[in-house]
Amino acid sequence: MNYTKEQIEFLKSLDFMKLGQAINRGQWQSAAMTIRRLDMKAKEVGMQDFERNFTGIRQSINRKDGTEAKQILAVVVNKRAKRLNLISEETNK
């Protein structure tokens, strides 16, 4: 699959790391703002398949359920890593 420059930038975004840090530290307001930013950017670049995961993270943040938020974030990070690996493989061909 060919990714646009904007999609690659989204996948490389430091917001994923910031979200994990905010959740780990129990900084719920920061986590909420970060997931909102990630969700908006995903929609903007046409990566709707993250939407369900982001909704789950947002709901977990609203309940201040760090364990659930971390579990869903792990799924998102795995999906993101797979895509970045595919992009890297395509680039190195």
What are these regions (language model features)?
Residues M1-Q21, K41-K93:
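Amphipathic, coiled-coil-like alpha-helical segments
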Residues N24-W28:
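Alpha-helical segments in soluble extracytoplasmic regions
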